[in-house]
UniProtKB/Swiss-Prot annotation:
CDD domains reported for this sequence: URO-D (cd00717)
GO molecular function: uroporphyrinogen decarboxylase activity
Protein name (database record): Uroporphyrinogen decarboxylase
Organism for this UniProt entry: Psychrobacter cryohalolentis (strain ATCC BAA-1226 / DSM 17306 / VKM B-2378 / K5)
Annotated metabolic or biological route of this protein: Porphyrin-containing compound metabolism; protoporphyrin-IX biosynthesis; coproporphyrinogen-III from 5-aminolevulinate: step 4/4
NCBIfam families (alphabetical): hemE (TIGR01464)
Residues at which substrate binds: 40-44, 90, 167, 222, 355
Xref: InterPro entries: UROD/MetE-like_sf, Uroporphyrinogen_deCO2ase_HemE, Uroporphyrinogen_deCOase
Positions of the record's site feature: Transition state stabilizer: 90
Function field: Catalyzes the decarboxylation of four acetate groups of uroporphyrinogen-III to yield coproporphyrinogen-III.
Cellular component GO terms held in the UniProt record: cytosol
UniProt record, GO biological process: protoporphyrinogen IX biosynthetic process from glutamate
Keyword DNA repair assigned: no
Entry EC no(s): 4.1.1.37
Lineage: Bacteria, Pseudomonadati, Pseudomonadota, Gammaproteobacteria, Moraxellales
Length: 378
């Protein structure tokens, strides 16, 4: 059975998709209005999310509870006219499954009890059977896809190898990546060994999410922007490119979005991948990004690189905009969409925030954002 036939057989398990606006935009097909969703759209800014999380007891218990993970995924779709759902989970599920002891401290974010600091730590990392150690994620994907009943497409996701490695080596979040960058410059082979293991796990993890029901995939390279130019190419992009290429072999019809926070400087580099779309944070104007990608595609084609004709863009409203008044939010959305369509394009764009929505946003302001996107005349 071909990969395409396999994907078709998977789709037969679920209700037909009713709103395919986002998928059409990613394929550069005509759309009636701009599709929109929000990173972290199921999260702490919603009172109903807080109530469900309190019932679960803690964050990871919520992630591992199929019914509650399904519930919080659906909550924003009951409030807002969103064009996609995204699996409720965490980017650190892979290192947690590798035995690093993930835990959360109030006000400090995720931490690991057993960070990777020496070769023995690295050698102990298991080769994951994602359908065993991360089966709760796959159960959630299937449950969510079934509950959506074809309303909108479902995103699956993973952290990038570089981003996962920073947490695993630092033992949590970091401002300076002291240990990770220390290995990068003093023992790069050690870091490459870790990134190689992680890339293999990310491929299998995202593959399993598609089999479970995910219709789109996003790779979150949240800390790729912390790297220098050459280091980004070698320690982040190379592994992201490998992941996307393998996913396209296994599931050629599944769109892949690659989001590198702080990666606007490297759009020309990221263009040399099989990703269908590139995510932008708020520091890069969308019209400029379109121009860079158009030129990059021209140069890559000139050098006989086998690529699709173009790449869609996703993003990129500053999440802090949602602290503003409704009038300010609408004005900023209109400016963002003016930029997105400035070069005459009428598709190939998905509206989103430039990073995740924060816990302090008024839920009513999120609705202003979403409605303003849909109200904009392309």
């Amino acid at each position: 059975m071909s990969a395409s036939d396999n994907n078709n057989s998977l789709e037969q398990k679920f209700a037909p998709l009713k709103n395919d606006r986002l998928l059409r935009a990613l394929r550069f097909e005509p759309i009636d209005t701009t599709p929109v969703w929000m990173m972290r759209q199921a999260g702490r800014y919603l009172p109903e999310y807080k109530a469900t999380r309190a019932e679960a007891g803690d964050f990871m218990s919520l992630c591992k509870d199929t019914a509650r993970a399904t519930e919080v995924t659906l909550q924003p779709l009951r409030r807002y006219d969103l064009d996609a759902a995204i699996l409720f989970s965490d980017i650190l599920t892979i290192p947690d499954a590798m035995g690093l002891g993930l835990y959360f401290e109030a006000g400090e974010g995720p931490k690991f009890k057993h960070p990777i600091r020496q070769q023995a730590d690295l050698d102990r990392l298991p080769v994951l059977d994602v359908n065993d150690s991360l089966d709760y994620v796959m159960r959630a994907v299937t449950s969510i896809r079934t509950a959506l009943n074809g309303q909108v497409p479902l995103f699956g996701f993973s952290g990038s190898p570089w981003t996962l490695a920073t947490y695993m080596i630092e033992g949590g979040s970091s401002k300076d990546y002291r240990y990770t960058k220390g290995f990068l410059y003093s023992n790069p082979d050690f870091l490459h060994q870790l990134l190689d293991k992680l890339a293999t796990s990310v491929i299998d993890y995202l593959d399993a999410q598609v089999v479970a029901g995910a219709q789109i995939l996003q790779i979150f390279d949240s800390w790729g922007g912390a790297l220098g130019h050459r280091q980004f190419i070698d320690f982040s992009h190379a592994y992201n490119k490998r992941i996307v290429a393998e996913l396209k072999v296994r599931h050629p019809e599944i769109p892949v979005v690659l989001f590198t926070k702080g990666g606007g400087l490297w759009l020309d580099i990221q263009a040399d991948s099989e990703a269908d779309a590139l995510g932008l944070d708020w520091t890069m104007p969308i019209d400029r990004a379109r121009q860079v990608l158009t030129e990059s595609q021209r140069q890559l084609t000139k050098h006989h690189k086998k690529l699709q004709s173009s790449k869609a863009i996703q993003g990129n409203l500053d999440p802090a905009t949602l602290y503003g008044s409704p009038a300010t939010i609408r004005a900023e959305v209109n400016a963002m969409l003016d930029s997105a369509y400035a070069n005459g394009e009428k598709t190939g764009y998905v509206a989103n925030l430039g990073h995740g929505i924060t816990q302090w946003v008024n839920p009513d302001n999120a609705k202003v954002f979403i409605d303003a996107v849909h109200d904009y005349k392309i």
